[in-house]
């Protein structure tokens, strides 16, 4: 009897040990179809697409901070602009013959229309709620002074009238008219100063953090979606079947687990480069990153806030990168209006606002150090600009503000440190390395891992960027009738251009404006503002662009 009891006891212990081992393994390794690294707007947007396209796929999102949308997607860490080239002068460069190129502006505007359609669709599905909580109508204006700049803006306005996307834009050189549009900018200004402005009523202010939170909250309603906060990726390893084993550390209790994923998206903002390098895919060797931060002056004084309802962008100074141009913006943050002015560039070796001072050094490798050196040597003007920005005093920043708000008072403003942006440096066969404006989707040949690098125009074009990723990584599925039908339901204009089609442009703007609660009046015929004869430009070295 004792032998039987002992044998049963041994079997029980053995079975219990097997059970415990199985549980330990389960806790150590989790399986998922899609792993989203980073709790920002890019991961949230991709997850939302995939939820409609493949509702049965399991998804896991990991975020190193204690909440989602706390880095670059956070409303206070970016300019909150719905970038559509209505006012951003860097998207319409002047050619050597003096003409204005609008190709980039058209592309940026087309991209933002996709974002508007994506958000409108999510509102109709109940994924996004209360549109005013994340998007509001704020007119977009360009404002310049000086004869050459006025001539440029007049020519830009005339050139943009060739596109159906920019109908409704108005132009004026009249002080009284511009004061009506933006009183804060004009009051106290020299009445003899030569000025010009354009204004488009359908501009927007967007809280990308709120969009991110709402998208992820909707994803969490499904049992096959898991969100893990305070979770940092420590390693990525490709398996023999082309899946990935990703080691994730719990920053609260120090434990680690492995997540086995069929597809991995690295949407970790500034940290994406280091994680892409960690993956070991050969495509990562072509890239390096350079971090640039931004500061804004902020006013919450009702006397200032209630006197300004516009986003007003100027023209970059000679020698400064185009995206460095100051702008004075109406924002809607935390449910109330504020006014921001900036940005002022800052420098830190961190790749994230909540990153490590070792980020830049640890991302430097034998394969990307030379491209970084070439970019530094070839963009000395940019280096000088960044140094000059870092050296700015409080008085310097206030004087810059007064160029756009002549009657500004120091006591109405405080300085705010916004997010970090990691600019793309890419290996180039001719130049060794080039600084790239924009974003790039980098993926392996097998389509099992992809990362988003870059900073501008960023969040405002999350929907088209993730659409591009789907086409690049899931090409066969995208071409299937099922995915085509779903994508066209999400983005009605998918697969065709709005530019040049007045009826289609007006139809989409009307639809998205109604759903998102935005102002939209059918544009009238453009005015007869004459196009000036611009002088040919001296051939100059192109100034590298950056995003702040």
From Swiss-Prot:
Pathway: Carbohydrate metabolism; tricarboxylic acid cycle; oxaloacetate from (S)-malate (quinone route): step 1/1
Membrane-traversing stretches: none
Domain of life according to the entry: Bacteria
Top EC class, one word: oxidoreductase
Keywords, comma-separated and alphabetical: FAD, Flavoprotein, Oxidoreductase, Tricarboxylic acid cycle
Gene Ontology MF terms in the entry: 2-hydroxyglutarate dehydrogenase activity; L-malate dehydrogenase (quinone) activity
GO biological process, one term: tricarboxylic acid cycle
Protein's UniProt keywords contain Transmembrane helix: no
EC number, UniProt record: 1.1.5.4
Listed cofactors: FAD
InterPro entries attached to this UniProt entry: FAD/NAD-bd_sf, MQO
Reactions this protein catalyses: (S)-malate + a quinone = a quinol + oxaloacetate
Disulfide bonds: none
Family indicated by similarity: Belongs to the MQO family.
Classification via HAMAP family: MQO
Name of the protein in question: Probable malate:quinone oxidoreductase
